[in-house]
């Protein structure tokens, strides 16, 4: 920061030290600084608006993603239960086939034994 402006000596209002051309009055300098600060504030406000918009968009996308994840989880649970039912169904079907195969083998063995021992 620059040093604070000192009031001009009497009779030298607006005059530069050393008798040169007059400089801008202190009021103009403060107005210029005020305008620069106001421009910076407006720039920061614009940036913050953009950031808030981005945050809101991100929040919306996250909400949509959360909804999709919930739907996917529900679908996965349904798939898991139907897969377990299907597995159990085919296990019983396999057991029935093994029992039938064993019965057929037993009948064949009985027929062979009866045929050769009679």
From Swiss-Prot:
Coiled coil: none annotated. Residues 33-93 form the v-SNARE coiled-coil homology domain. GO terms for cellular component: cell surface; glutamatergic synapse; mitochondrion; neuromuscular junction; neuron projection; synaptic vesicle membrane. It holds the Pfam family Synaptobrevin. InterPro entries: Synaptobrevin-like, Synaptobrevin/VAMP, V_SNARE_CC. The modification Phosphoserine is found at residue 63. The keyword Protein biosynthesis does not apply. Residues 1-36 are annotated as: Disordered. Keywords: Coiled coil, Cytoplasmic vesicle, Disease variant, Membrane, Phosphoprotein, Synapse, Synaptosome, Transmembrane, Transmembrane helix. (Microbial infection) Targeted and hydrolyzed by C.botulinum neurotoxin type X (BoNT/X) which hydrolyzes the 68-Arg-|-Ala-69 bond and probably inhibits neurotransmitter release. It remains unknown whether BoNT/X is ever produced, or what organisms it targets. Signal peptide: none annotated. Residues 117-118 are vesicular. Residues 1-15 have a biased composition (Low complexity). It comes from the Eukaryota. CDD domains: R-SNARE_VAMP2 (cd15870). The chain crosses the membrane at residues 97-116. Highly expressed in the zona incerta and rostral periolivary region of the brain. Other neuroanatomical regions show negligible expression. Expressed in the retina, expression observed in the outer segments of the photoreceptors, in the outer and inner plexiform layers, and in a subset of ganglion cells. Residues 1-96 are cytoplasmic. One of its GO terms (biological process) is regulation of synaptic vesicle fusion to presynaptic active zone membrane. Belongs to the synaptobrevin family. It is linked to Defects in Vamp1 are the cause of lethal-wasting (lew) phenotype, a mice mutant strain. The lew mutant phenotype is inherited in an autosomal recessive manner and manifests with neurological signs. Lew animals are characterized by a general lack of movement and wasting, eventually leading to death before weaning. The affected animals die near postnatal day 15 (P15). By P10, the mutants are noticeably immobile and lay on their side. Before this stage, mutants can be identified by a failure to attempt to right themselves. Interacts with VAPA and VAPB. Involved in the targeting and/or fusion of transport vesicles to their target membrane. This is Vesicle-associated membrane protein 1.
């Amino acid at each position: 920061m620059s040093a604070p402006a000192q009031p001009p000596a009497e009779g030298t209002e607006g005059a530069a030290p050393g008798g040169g051309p007059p400089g801008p009055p202190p009021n103009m300098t403060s107005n210029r600084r005020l305008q620069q600060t106001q421009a910076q504030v407006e720039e920061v406000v614009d940036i913050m608006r953009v950031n808030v918009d981005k945050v809101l968009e991100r929040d919306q996308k996250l909400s949509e993603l959360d909804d999709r994840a919930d739907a996917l989880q529900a679908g996965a649970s349904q798939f898991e239960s139907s897969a377990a039912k299907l597995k159990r169904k085919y296990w019983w079907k396999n057991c029935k086939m093994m029992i039938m195969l064993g019965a057929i083998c037993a009948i064949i063995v009985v027929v062979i034994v009866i045929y050769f021992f009679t």
